[in-house]
């Protein structure tokens, strides 16, 4: 999850998973994994900031885990976001409004990561029922990490996995699930790619709508409609035609 970085070096999803892992051995394991991933995949300054925020989150988990307040639904996400902000606010003050917007989005992702991770790691059914989209958010994190690998000519093999996930959701599930899932996956790809555009979100959502409405239940037609919708959306936007066709 440390590889699923946004805005040039933030790793909020890894920090959220540290918080979701709680105190004790599981929390230590998450901290070690996130720290190792940060050192391997992030710029050095961001790796240090991620490590510092992770240590603060783990320490706060150990300090508060036996309190009633800790069991409240909103406490852990706010705790993780607060610990991350306590490290990042110095850099926000230095870099100005643009960095503040990036940091705010990273804090939101950290809180969502903590909420989804706790639901996924929970042993009780109630937590999973309250957060039915938690597995989707973790899947999104993995897809963002996979799509961060790019070849010299811009080809990212991980984006094929994201498009396959959108196609499967559109084919197997109803529009109430498939379209929000496609939009979230597209937003994750846009955040990971940087640049401030929402091309992936728009094209994935459009393709999910088209497949779900016109060809759901027919594998060949679903694949053809999906490919056509991606081509119609991407090629007029000066996308690299060879890469689009390869995807």
Task: Give, region by region, the residue ranges found by the protein language model.
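Membrane-embedded alpha-helical hairpins and interfacial helices in multi-pass inner-membrane proteins
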Residues: 1-180, 184-247
């Amino acid at each position: 999850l440390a590889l699923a970085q946004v805005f040039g070096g933030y790793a909020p999803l890894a920090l959220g998973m540290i918080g979701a892992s709680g105190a004790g051995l599981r929390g230590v394991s998450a901290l070690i994994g996130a720290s190792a991933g940060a050192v391997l995949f992030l710029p050095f300054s961001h790796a240090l900031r991620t490590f510092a925020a992770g240590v603060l989150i783990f320490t706060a988990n150990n300090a508060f885990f036996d309190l009633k307040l800790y069991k409240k639904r909103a406490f852990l996400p706010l705790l993780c976001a607060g610990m991350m902000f306590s490290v990042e606010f110095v850099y926000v003050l230095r870099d100005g409004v643009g960095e503040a917007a990036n940091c705010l989005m990273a804090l939101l992702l950290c809180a969502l990561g903590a909420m989804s991770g706790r639901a996924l790691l929970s042993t009780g059914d109630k937590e999973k029922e309250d957060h039915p989209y938690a597995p989707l958010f973790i899947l999104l994190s993995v897809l963002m990490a996979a799509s961060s690998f790019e070849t010299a000519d811009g080809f990212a093999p991980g984006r094929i996995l994201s498009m396959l996930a959108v196609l499967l959701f559109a084919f197997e599930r109803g529009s109430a699930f498939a379209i929000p899932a496609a939009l979230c996956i597209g937003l994750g790809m846009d955040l990971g790619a940087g640049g401030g555009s929402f091309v992936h979100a728009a094209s994935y959502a459009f393709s999910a709508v088209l497949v779900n409405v016109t060809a759901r239940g027919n594998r060949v037609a679903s694949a053809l409609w999906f490919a056509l919708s991606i081509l119609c959306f991407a090629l007029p936007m000066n996308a690299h035609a060879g890469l689009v066709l390869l995807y």
